[in-house]
Design a protein with these regions (language model features):
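Terminal, low-structured helical/coil segments at or just beyond the last alpha-helical repeat
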Residues: 1-7, 11-14, 274-304
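Conserved alpha-helical positions within TPR/SEL1-like repeat arrays
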Residues: 13, 45-53, 76-87, 109-120, ...
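Canonical positions in the second alpha-helix
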Residues: 31, 66-67, 100-101, 134-135, ...
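Structural marker of alpha-solenoid helical repeat scaffolds
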Residues: 34-36, 70, 104, 138, ...
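Residue-level recognition of tetratricopeptide repeat
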Residues: 38-40, 74, 108, 142, ...
Length: 304
């Protein structure tokens, strides 16, 4: 190993560990000038990972491609290409390279996991289920895969299967909030109010800044006409969730309307619109606001 390469590499590593990514990258660039062919793959991985952390997907992709050209059997580089293509919303190429990485490394559990995620976000549930199961077969403690599998089963109305795998996720990692949240969703859909409330609260204890817990609890309270409880939980959400979410103010506005507190509803609706103007079209057709559709302040807020 060239001594200059080694020195630049060590300094770059130290800066990376200290969190100075830009300076670390500059020193890895200097190291590359003195790199032997055998050093390049490791060096390109370092640069790819840094560019990925800097959210420069194109640059990261370029270095993963360089590794692939040097050694087509580097499964991690193919997997890296898939990850970057997914971040660039090129799902076809992402799918292709996840599958290619699995061909090179058949026991690549992370590739199966992220391929399953990719299928899931495209609503290709049967394929997602298949790949999550393969990930679990390779990594029995994959609590995230169990959770994600449970969420899919809930989406396709297979509630017993959903609860079974969500329980497995909790058994493996009791501190992970998502399976509790998803059990709340399942029990809510099954109209089991007390169970849904319990699991949403369990999720909140583990992740108090996750806005969807509060939104789902609010919807649950509204469904059972407990409007004061809906407002109280949204008060708590607005305190705990940062940055502020338009949906929290919107739901609280709806709850105030249920209690005929129109001034407070209008105030929250304005806050919601200020945070996200896309909510305007929804508000125009929302029956919760029917009583104030002709109100001057409402018209001013939504710009009718």
């Amino acid at each position: 190993m060239n001594l200059k390469y080694k020195n630049f590499y060590i300094m770059a590593e130290n800066l990376y560990e200290a969190g100075d990514l830009e300076k670390s990258l500059a020193l890895f660039e200097n190291a590359e000038k003195y790199a032997d062919k055998d050093d390049l793959i490791d060096l390109y991985y370092k640069k790819a990972f840094i560019y990925d952390e800097l959210e420069n997907c194109e640059k990261a992709l370029g270095y993963f491609e360089k590794i692939h050209k040097l050694d087509s059997n580097e499964a991690e580089a193919i997997y890296g290409m898939a990850m970057e293509y997914e971040k660039l919303d090129n799902f076809d190429l992402a799918e292709h390279f996840y599958k290619e990485s699995i061909k090179v490394k058949p026991n690549y559990d992370r590739a199966y996991f992220f391929l399953a995620n990719l299928m899931d976000i495209q609503d290709r549930y049967e394929e997602a289920i298949e790949y999550y199961k393969k990930s679990i077969n390779l990594r029995a403690d994959d609590y995230m895969a169990y959770n994600n599998l449970g969420a899919i089963y809930e989406n396709i109305d297979e509630f017993d299967k959903a609860l079974e795998v969500l329980d497995k996720s909790i058994e493996i990692e009791p501190s992970y909030f998502r399976p509790y949240f998803n059990k709340g969703v399942v029990y809510g859909r099954l109209k089991k109010y007390d169970e849904a409330l319990y699991f949403y609260n369990q999720a909140m204890q583990r992740k108090k800044d996750y806005s969807f817990i509060y939104l789902n609890l609010s919807a649950l309270f509204i469904e059972y006409k407990e409007y004061e409880k809906s407002i109280a939980i949204l008060d708590k959400a607005i305190k705990n969730v940062s940055p502020p979410k338009s949906s929290l103010y919107y739901n609280r506005a709806c709850s105030y309307m249920k209690l005929n507190k129109k001034e407070k509803a209008l105030k929250d609706l304005k806050r919601s619109v200020d945070l996200n103007r896309d909510i305007i079209d929804y508000a125009k057709s929302d029956p919760d606001f029917d009583e104030i559709k002709n109100n001057e302040e409402f018209i001013e807020i939504i710009g009718v």
